[in-house]
Amino acid sequence: MSGKLTIITGPMYSGKTTELLSFVEIYKLGKKKVAVFKPKIDSRYHSTMIVSHSGNGVEAHVIERPEEIRKYIEEDTRGVFIDEVQFFSPGLFEVVKDLLDRGIDVFCAGLDLTHKQNPFETTALLLSLADTVIKKKAVCHRCGEYNATLTLKVAGGEEEIDVGGQEKYIAVCRDCYNTLKKRV
């Protein structure tokens, strides 16, 4: 039986990593072997753990290239969990397809759009393959409504790949994004 791909996406501060960690916990409670991964570029909260903004975390294999995932997969691995997929190369698509064909469920969390509202290529590729998509929202940093679907960069230049947290990014709704972008 083929594995299933679940994508958890949305803006920053929407609970993507928290949701990913809840799926890890479900698999562990079911005594299923898991493999958890994060990109080396993301060391915001911990160098070897996936950690949510709320502080919950789990140990992870830290990798630079998607192909490295294969060396950590064992015969009895049932679930693969990958955080911050937007930071990986598009080669992740082929790795995930291979895992699914081997009957392994894959859960990926990551941003769908850059702060300029451009799609992250790797996330977009994975979305095209997904069996289930969980699109998260956040509370808008400006108006306070639970309708934020975008991430706005408020410090640190215009680079689209720029790892950071609350010192650089806020979650905003589309109306507030447009209002705030006019000021920048």
UniProtKB/Swiss-Prot annotation:
Keyword ATP-binding applies: yes
Enzyme class, broadest EC rank: transferase
Stored InterPro entries: P-loop_NTPase (IPR027417), Thymidine_kinase (IPR001267), Thymidine_kinase_CS (IPR020633)
Molecular function as annotated in GO: ATP binding; thymidine kinase activity; zinc ion binding
Reaction catalyzed: thymidine + ATP = dTMP + ADP + H(+)
GO cellular component: cytosol
Primary location recorded for the protein, binned into one broad class: cytoplasm
Keywords assigned by UniProt, alphabetized: ATP-binding, Cytoplasm, DNA synthesis, Kinase, Metal-binding, Nucleotide-binding, Transferase, Zinc
A Pfam family: TK
SUPFAM superfamilies: Glucocorticoid receptor-like (DNA-binding domain), P-loop containing nucleoside triphosphate hydrolases
Record carries keyword Zinc: yes
Protein residues bound to ATP: 10-17, 83-86
Any single biological process term in GO: thymidine metabolic process
Location in the cell: Cytoplasm
Residues at which Zn(2+) binds: 140, 143, 173, 176
Active site positions, chain numbering: 84 (proton acceptor)
Annotated EC: 2.7.1.21
Similarity comment: family membership: Belongs to the thymidine kinase family.
Subunit field text: Homotetramer.
Record-given protein name: Thymidine kinase
Source organism per UniProt: Thermotoga petrophila (strain ATCC BAA-488 / DSM 13995 / JCM 10881 / RKU-1)
